[in-house]
């Protein structure tokens, strides 16, 4: 489970507990980043298993996690598993006869979908994503039922957010006077910018504007400490920092979509075209994709000159909450 997924399932868990009075169990793999986020979210998740570094370690860690999950889940005795495509979780649910509901917005993640969707009862994803991208994972004649919603997963925790500028000022930042940046996943195989490509953008921004940086990796503080940037070293939920920024610049998608939902211009440097980003853009949300340094700076200049503006209109009337199809499934309406 990634930090984004913990945010999603923590939010879905609270929603289902409140609307249906259901009892929920949230689990996550044990990493430093996940523990820090879990502490912010109220320690709701139980940690089960770890990650491996190479193929054999990953396989062994997955097998050990299945055993641990089987014990925990069997004692909890749930009616449903609600998860991202997690081979270990889905295998346990299948083995224990538990119905499975899968969420996803990453059709490019081939292996985990191939190992989970055919064993799942329900598959929920945004209508912004072309259905054909997921069809290769659906077994013909199988039992997986597809449900779509007009929205993005980030709405689950952005909706109802109330800005608090004191959380920004504590870092010495003046509201609406800084850029918020987050480095990319430079170790991901699909990322082609390289460390220096993103650093070049941050350097350019810091020459004329205040820049706050939320690290992705432990060594990011060292990687960018030669630049004039404010490193947010403690664990944070980024919504306040995003809301009060001039704009966000990120190598990933989650922060960009969060900011766009808040009406804040966001620049994403993610190398692949993401359907949910394009869907938000088509509805007028200020999310922009850059594929080069020059394109990124052109967008940023548009933000600085005012040709690209904040959007004040609420997202609530345009988008469907991702919990709605889940609620209908659990209530037996679909």
Task: Annotate each PLM feature.
Residues 261-307:
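Catalytic binding pocket for nucleotide-activated donors in carbohydrate/polymer assembly enzymes
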């Amino acid at each position: 489970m990634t930090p984004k997924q913990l945010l999603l399932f923590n939010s879905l868990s609270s929603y289902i507990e409140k609307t249906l009075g259901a009892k929920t169990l949230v689990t996550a793999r044990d990493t430093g980043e996940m523990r820090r986020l879990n502490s912010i979210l109220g320690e709701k998740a139980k940690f089960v298993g770890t990650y491996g570094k190479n193929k054999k370690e990953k396989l062994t860690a997955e097998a050990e996690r299945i055993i641990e999950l089987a014990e925990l889940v069997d004692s909890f005795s749930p009616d449903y598993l609600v998860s991202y495509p997690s081979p270990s979780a889905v295998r346990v649910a299948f083995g224990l006869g538990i119905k499975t509901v899968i969420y996803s917005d990453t059709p490019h993640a081939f292996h985990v979908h191939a190992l989970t969707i055919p064993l799942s009862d329900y598959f929920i994803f945004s209508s912004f994503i072309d259905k054909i991208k997921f069809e290769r994972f659906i077994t013909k004649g199988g039992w997986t039922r597809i449900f779509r919603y007009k929205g993005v997963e980030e709405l689950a925790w952005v909706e109802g957010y109330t800005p608090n500028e004191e959380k920004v000022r504590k870092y010495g930042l003046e509201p609406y006077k800084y850029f918020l940046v987050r480095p990319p996943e430079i170790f991901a195989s699909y990322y082609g910018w390289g460390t220096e490509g993103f650093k070049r953008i941050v350097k350019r921004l810091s020459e004329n504007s205040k820049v706050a940086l939320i690290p992705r990796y432990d060594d990011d503080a060292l990687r960018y400490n030669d630049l004039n940037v404010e490193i947010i070293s403690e664990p944070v939920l980024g919504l306040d920092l995003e809301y009060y920024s001039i704009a966000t610049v990120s190598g990933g998608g989650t922060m960009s979509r969060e900011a766009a939902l808040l009406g804040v211009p966001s620049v994403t440097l993610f190398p692949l075209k993401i359907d949910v980003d394009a869907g938000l853009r088509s509805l007028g949300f200020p999310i922009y994709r850059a594929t080069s340094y020059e394109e990124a700076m052109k967008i940023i200049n548009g933000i600085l000159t005012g040709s690209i503006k904040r959007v004040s209109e609420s997202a609530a009337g345009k988008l469907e909450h991702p919990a709605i199809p889940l609620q209908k499934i659990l209530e037996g309406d679909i």
